[in-house]
Amino acid sequence: MSWPGAMGKRLKSCKLLFFFYPADFTFVCPTELEDLENHYDAFQKLGCEIYSVSCDTEFVHKAWHDHSERIAKITYPMVADPTHALARDFEVLIESAGLAERGTFIINPEGKIVAYEVNAGNVGRNADELLRKVQACQFVHAHGDEVCPAKWQPGAETLKPSLDLVGAL
């Protein structure tokens, strides 16, 4: 993935979490965005920047920020995508509705998507689990010969894939 100009230089220096959500002034979305804000410092300590993205305009973002106590707390960037360019590029655009699906993308400093998921519109995401996924992606990036099993947490045992492990787990 390539990013233009100064934005590209900034984005290549860290890990990224793109967090697409359907729309401002809705129901599940503010609970997710508040949960992310409550964990934002932990993401920052990992060198991971969060970008929440909806197909709303910056004016709608501003109105929501001014209207909602939950959204007023947010300090990470809220990206407006009224042309649907990002949602289309990440293949989460619901063309018929002009909305983004509830998609999450973890991108490493090389610009490679290393984890992604798309939830149903009525199912919220968990910032604790997203943080764990970022930590796992960072671990395997730094330790190329190891993998993180289910429910892995930092400091827990990892696996080294080999023929000896085939059928042993």
Indicate where each model-derived feature is located.
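Chalcogenol-based redox active-site neighborhoods
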Residues: 1-169
